[in-house]
């Protein structure tokens, strides 16, 4: 917000045009654009359509205008809506640096801002302005400037009582005004004229910033500026409670398809909304979009890089083709209904070549694909009950909706996610600690870490989930990561080891759960080639692909340099090629060997109690 007072206050001269000592140009002609607004709207943003308008936030200093405007801008951009925020403090450092706070200066301040906002809106952006703009006539003039250009203008009164604004008083301006050090301070000795008929009133003393943003978004949706699907909620596929009895009765009478554990894990992924906006297993159109473009394209560009499919044998197809619905059975229990099924050919070699970049049958997930049925089945999924595995870890299996609520309860203003399938060593911790530090430096006050181990199928030589969770708990107990600002939860997806293709899936799933930032390190979702032993994917490509991937617009990728053990400093550190001799790369193979043999890793590699958990697992494995 702009400084709302001045040590030198001029007499109010009214709201007429000011000469400002400048000669008015008369030899100018308005030049019409060759590009129409509709045509411009087709290429601005990721969703198409002209959305130009101005959202004019007005209110007292400390009411929350800047906070709401910045959060609104972030929300819109994250959902593919182009926008720009004009803030009072920022404008007064450049365009309006020659203006003070007298009534006539305020009038000119608002006029210039309105003209600039009109240009942004005409360019197809949602322009958000954050200014005290205390006078009704000045705000009305701003509206007329937009209406004269046939551009929507939404006045939003950010309403907080004066005593609340004084309590907030981050800059200490109210205190100075009360002491007489600032004259003409709005709300103290200069009048603020409340809007008489704003499009929206935000009560910031009663609503948090997310609620305020949602109210503005709903206004923009009502006025057809923002499409409704631009802010879709998590799409869960559980049958509503009031329809559950009927659905279960229906499921008992339907023909059925047996599914395995990995299928069931994908059912959970879909049911909990991780693959939003999918309404079930992919139909052929969705499958082809995913396979060829790594995205869903109907309703906007939505990143979804891995096929989420259900397979069937030739016998299953002959039995079920033509049915309008059938039940899915897992371990003797009917867990879901697939309605309006669509059968299409499972071209396994083509799928593997595109998803993994190899058809090597020794790759563990490719091996599973090659052994699956020759048909894929898409359809609308209705899951009957919440899925529990009864392994002592269900309390960590938080859905995207539950995670969002958890972050809200923690008053998080930034959520950064870290996906892992291995035990946490201090190199991982370095990435997470550094991200937390960077976010604080960028002005976030309560960044929260989502430590999100993968909980679905993994290959045989990976550490089982139960032991990984014990190890993660030890890392938190030792204070390597801050338990007060960390949420540990389990991501239910199977692990596909698909490198840059797979890491896009990992990233977008955390996006659905409310993450704003995603940490990516070396060789994410990669593995050695099962036959040559060399890296199947170039270790740097995962991070590079994420920074370019379409449809990952609601979060920011945080790529990091490689972390390795610094022998001189005796701790994990970022690798420096100029001091290569100081560094040691401790591979997973070596780590497992040390643990199996009861040896300790180098000092500073991993928290001691966390290493003890790992050693205990490998000892138990030796005895098995």
From Swiss-Prot:
Entry-annotated residues carrying N6-acetyllysine: 12
Give the EC number: 2.7.7.4, 2.7.1.25
Adenylyl-sulfate kinase: annotated span: 1-225
CDD domains membership: APSK (cd02027), ATPS (cd00517)
Q: What class of enzyme is it?
A: transferase
Outline the segment boundaries, as ranges, of region: Sulfate adenylyltransferase: 234-624
Q: Where does this protein hold adenosine 5'-phosphosulfate?
A: 89-92, 101, 106-109, 132-133, 171, 184-185
Q: What does this protein do?
A: Bifunctional enzyme with both ATP sulfurylase and APS kinase activity, which mediates two steps in the sulfate activation pathway. The first step is the transfer of a sulfate group to ATP to yield adenosine 5'-phosphosulfate (APS), and the second step is the transfer of a phosphate group from ATP to APS yielding 3'-phosphoadenylylsulfate (PAPS: activated sulfate donor used by sulfotransferase). In mammals, PAPS is the sole source of sulfate; APS appears to be only an intermediate in the sulfate-activation pathway.
Q: Which family does it belong to?
A: In the N-terminal section; belongs to the APS kinase family. In the C-terminal section; belongs to the sulfate adenylyltransferase family.
Q: What is this protein called?
A: Bifunctional 3'-phosphoadenosine 5'-phosphosulfate synthase 1
Which organism encodes this protein? Answer: Cavia porcellus (Guinea pig)
Classification from the root reads:
Eukaryota, Metazoa, Chordata, Craniata, Vertebrata
Q: Which gene encodes it?
A: PAPSS1
């Amino acid at each position: 917000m702009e400084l709302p007072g001045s040590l030198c206050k001029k007499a109010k001269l009214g709201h007429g045009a000011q000469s400002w000592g400048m000669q008015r140009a008369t030899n100018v002609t308005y030049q019409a654009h060759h590009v129409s607004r509709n045509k411009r709207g087709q290429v601005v943003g990721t969703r198409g359509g002209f959305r130009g308008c101005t959202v004019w936030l007005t209110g007292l200093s400390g009411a929350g205008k800047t906070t709401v405007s910045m959060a609104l801008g972030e929300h819109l951009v994250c959902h593919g809506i182009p926008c720009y925020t004009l803030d009072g403090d920022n404008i007064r450092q450049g365009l309006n640096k020659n203006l003070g706070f007298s009534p006539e200066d305020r009038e000119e301040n608002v006029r210039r801002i309105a003209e600039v906002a009109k240009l942004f809106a005409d360019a197809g952006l949602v322009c958000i302005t954050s200014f005290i703009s205390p006078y009704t006539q000045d705000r009305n003039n701003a509206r007329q400037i937009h209406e004269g250009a046939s551009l929507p203008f939404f006045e939003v009164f950010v309403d907080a009582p004066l005593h609340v604004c004084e309590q907030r008083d981050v800059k200490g301006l109210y205190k100075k005004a009360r002491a007489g050090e600032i004259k003409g301070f709005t709300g103290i000795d200069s009048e603020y004229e409340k809007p008489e008929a704003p499009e929206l009133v935000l009560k910031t003393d009663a609503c948090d910033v997310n609620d305020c943003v949602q109210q503005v978004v709903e206004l923009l949706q009502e006025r057809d500026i923002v499409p409704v699907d631009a802010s879709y909620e998590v799409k869960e596929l559980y049958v509503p409670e009031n329809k559950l009895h009927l659905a279960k009765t229906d499921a008992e009478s339907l023909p059925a398809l047996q599914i395995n554990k990995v299928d069931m894990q994908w059912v959970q992924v879909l049911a909990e909304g991780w693959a939003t906006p999918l309404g079930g297993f992919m139909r052929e159109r969705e499958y082809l979009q995913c396979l060829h473009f790594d995205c869903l394209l109907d309703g906007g560009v939505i990143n979804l890089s891995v096929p989420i499919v259900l397979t069937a044998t030739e016998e299953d197809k002959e039995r079920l083709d033509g049915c309008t619905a059938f039940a899915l059975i897992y371990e003797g229990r009917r867990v879901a209904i697939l309605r309006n099924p669509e059968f299409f050919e499972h071209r396994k070699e083509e799928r593997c070549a595109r998803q993994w970049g190899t058809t090597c049958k020794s790759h563990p997930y490719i091996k599973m694909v090659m052994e699956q049925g020759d048909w894929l089945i898409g359809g609308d999924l209705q899951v009957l009950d919440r899925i529990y595995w009864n392994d002592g870890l269900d309390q960590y299996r938080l859905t995207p909706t539950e995670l969002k609520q958890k972050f809200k309860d923690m008053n998080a203003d930034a959520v950064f996610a870290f996906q892992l399938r291995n035990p946490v060593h201090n190199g991982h911790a370095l990435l997470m600690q550094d991200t937390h530090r960077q976010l604080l430096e960028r002005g976030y006050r309560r960044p929260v870490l989502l430590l999100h181990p993968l909980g679905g199928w993994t290959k045989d030589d990976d550490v089982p989930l139960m032991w990984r969770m014990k190890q993660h708990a030890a890392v938190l107990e030792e204070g390597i990561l801050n338990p007060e600002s960390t949420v540990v939860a389990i991501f239910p997806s199977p692990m596909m080891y698909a490198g840059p293709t797979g890491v896009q899936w990992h990233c977008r799933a955390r996006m659905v759960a409310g993450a704003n930032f995603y940490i990516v390190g070396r060789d994410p979702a990669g593995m050695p080639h099962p036959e040559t032993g060399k890296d199947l994917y170039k270790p740097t490509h995962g991070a590079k692909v994420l920074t370019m991937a379409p449809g990952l617009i609601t979060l920011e990728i945080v790529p990091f340099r490689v972390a390795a053990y610094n022998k001189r400093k005796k701790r994990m550190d970022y690798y420096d090629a100029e001091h290569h001799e100081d560094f040691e790369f401790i591979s997973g193979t070596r780590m497992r060997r040390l643990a199996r043999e009861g040896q300790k890793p180098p000092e500073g590699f991993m928290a001691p109690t966390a290493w003890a958990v790992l050693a205990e697992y490998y000892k138990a494995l030796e005895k098995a």
